[in-house]
Structures are given as structure tokens and as C-alpha cells.
Amino acid sequence: TAECLKCPVMISFEDSLQYRGKADKYLEDGDIIDLDGETLKIAKTPGHTMGSVCIIAEESKTVFTGDTIFDTDLGRTDFKDGSEAEMIRSCREVIDKWPNDYRIYPGHDESATMKQVRTYNSEFLHCLEV
């Protein structure tokens, strides 16, 4: 918990509606967070949930994607506040803009470069085609 780690709780407002604790900050698209000299940029990527976000560290070419996108598939959209249409929009308007040398780190499973994602993730490629 935040008390144990002595750090602020940051979450999107949409996802906070299911969170039992108190948020210190609601994350918005484009927010910038300074983490000991590393600049983190928030990108809203609804689809898995309406409040899904990815955290981009441009200096290290790293993206923490949570359950939005994985090396070979996308996050589930069959939850109460998930949306396949929003996932498609997130893939087209946000994720597809990340350079090939950026490495994604999902909430679980393997990391991958965006070049690998563009090669092996058929669900992502399908979103770009529809």
C-alpha cells in the first residue's frame, strides 16, 4: 500500500471508481511525472478498461503498458468497462505511433520491442486494418 511504500497513489479517474483506496492524483492524458530525473509521460489507452493508461519513458525508450498490449496479443476487453472499439482506437491513435526501438513492459508476460509487436502481434495488426 501507499503507506508502506511512502509513495503517492496515482490512477486514472475512470479506474479509481473501482479502487477502494484514496488516490493522491488522477492521471490524465499527457501528464508528466518526474521520477528521480526520468520523465514519464502518461498516455490514456482505454480498451482493457476505460481508464487504462500506458507510462512512457522516452529517454530510455520504454513503455509500461499494463494490460493494454502484450508481445503477441492485446488486453481483454470483455470486462464491465472494457471496450473493443476503444481498444482499436488506442491501437491506431496511440500505440502505433511508438517507434520500433521502444520496448514495452506489460503487467505480465514478456517484454518486446515495438518492432516485434508489429511483426508477431496479430491482434494489434488487426486493429490497424479495421
Regions found by a protein language model. Give the residues of each.
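Active-site HxH/HxHxD metal-binding segment of metal-dependent hydrolases
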Residues: 1-38, 120-123
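Short gly/pro-enriched beta-turn/loop segments at secondary-structure junctions
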Residues: 28, 49-50
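Hydrophobic alpha-helical positions that pack around
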Residues: 45
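Metallo-beta-lactamase
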Residues: 3, 39, 50-129
